[in-house]
Curated annotation (Swiss-Prot):
Function text: This protein is one of the early assembly proteins of the 50S ribosomal subunit, although it is not seen to bind rRNA by itself. It is important during the early stages of 50S assembly.
Family per record: Belongs to the universal ribosomal protein uL13 family.
Keyword annotations: Ribonucleoprotein, Ribosomal protein
Organism listed in the record: Spiroplasma citri
Record-given protein name: Large ribosomal subunit protein uL13
Amino acid sequence: MRQTTILNSTKVEKKWYVIDAQGLVLGRLASKVAMILRGKNKPSYTPHVDCGDNVIILNADKINLSGNKLKGKMYYHHSQHPGGLKRTTAKNMLVKKPIYPVEHAIKGMLPKNKLGSKLFRNLFVYAGNEHPHEAQQPIKLELTNK
C-alpha cells in the first residue's frame, strides 16, 4: 500500500535560481517566480510548508510592462495624515525605486499570511547585473514572454 509523503521543513532541499529580467513582461515574470517561490513546480509540493526555492532577479530596472501600463498603472501609499494619499505612475516608480514594481507584483501573488511573508524573504531583486550570492552557486533560469 502506498502512502502520500508529507513534506516538512527538515526534508526540504532548496535550490538557488538567478533570472535576468531584462525585456521580460512584469506580470508573466511575477507569476512564474511566485510559482517557484511557493514550490509548485516540485512534485513534493505541500501547501503549508516553505518548500520553494530561492530566486535572484537581476536587471529589474529593465522590465517591460504590457499595454499602456507604463503611464496608466498607479502605485499608492499613504502618509497617515489627512489627505495624505500619494500616487505614482509605474514610469516614475521605475526611476525612483526600480525594484519596487517587481517585488510588489510578486508579493501580490503569494499567500497573504505568515507563510507568504516567509516565502517573500526567499526573493532577492537587484536593479543591476551584479548580485552578492555567488557563493550559493545559483542556477541560471531562462524565462520567455510566452
